[in-house]
């Protein structure tokens, strides 16, 4: 079995990695060591894991990605984005109206004359607006915080968030990552810096079938749960009044 084949498999299955060789490339050596290392907190009860505060990772750890969530954007916005991607006809009218307006209030202008020689300026202005929009989008991506659900080869599940810009939006489910020594682990969550994680790639094709629809259903269920929690809290407050 090759190292590349490990990237496409479920690491919780019984996998026999190829024998170590000094001729392996640096990337393959990292995969080998991370797979052979003892899984993080294997067999530790979940309540004890949550008690672990600011623990420093002391070895290379291999994980597979079960879920990627952009926690910078609201669930409702992400649901709308996915539904629009799946079926552009379902894009909400208010988003179409406000798309070019940015965050400011909608403004109207009364046109009293048309300068036919001003087409060049209009084109330049439109180009400038598009560039500004692209720059704003790029800046937003750099500021995005992602929550990753990770699984070790022992089957234990952990979470991770990035503390420096790391773009996980295109990460496929089943992708493999190696978390490096020096990473901080706090109450069940790895705090990732771009210099402390290696993205290996890979994909689990079964997990990614109808991925967008599955993720949309997942977000909708979480949104519904949040609403129930809010409504439940409101009812309790009314009962106590």
From Swiss-Prot:
One of its GO terms (molecular function) is enzyme activator activity. Keywords: Cell cycle, Cell division, Cytoplasm, DNA damage, DNA-binding, Meiosis, Nucleus. It holds the Pfam family RMI1_N_C. GO terms for biological process: cell division; DNA damage response; DNA topological change; double-strand break repair via homologous recombination; meiotic cell cycle. Belongs to the RMI1 family. This is RecQ-mediated genome instability protein 1. It is found in: Cytoplasm; Nucleus. Coiled coil: none annotated. The keyword Cell division applies. The gene is RMI1.
């Amino acid at each position: 079995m090759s190292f590349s084949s490990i990237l496409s498999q479920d690491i919780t299955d019984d996998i026999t990695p190829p024998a170590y060789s000094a001729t392996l490339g640096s990337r393959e050596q990292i995969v080998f060591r991370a797979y052979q290392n003892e899984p993080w907190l294997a067999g530790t009860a979940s309540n004890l894991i949550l008690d672990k505060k600011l623990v420093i990772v002391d070895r290379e750890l291999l994980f597979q990605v079960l879920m990627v969530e952009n926690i910078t954007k609201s669930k409702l916005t992400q649901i709308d984005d996915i539904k629009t991607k799946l079926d552009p006809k379902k894009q909400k009218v208010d988003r179409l109206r406000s798309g070019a307006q940015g965050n400011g209030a909608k403004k109207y202008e009364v046109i009293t004359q048309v300068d036919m020689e001003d087409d060049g300026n209009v084109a330049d202005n439109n180009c400038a607006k598009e560039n500004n929009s692209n720059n704003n989008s790029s800046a937003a991506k750099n500021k995005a915080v992602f929550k990753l659900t990770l699984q070790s080869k022992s089957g234990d599940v952990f979470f991770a968030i990035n503390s420096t810009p790391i773009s996980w939006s295109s990460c496929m489910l089943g992708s493999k990552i190696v978390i490096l020594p020096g990473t901080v682990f706090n109450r069940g969550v790895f705090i990732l810096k771009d210099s402390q994680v290696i993205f290996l790639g890979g994909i689990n094709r079964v997990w990614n079938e109808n991925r967008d629809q599955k993720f949309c259903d997942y977000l909708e269920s979480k949104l519904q749960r949040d609403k129930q929690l809010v409504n439940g809290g409101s009812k309790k407050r009314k009962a106590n009044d």
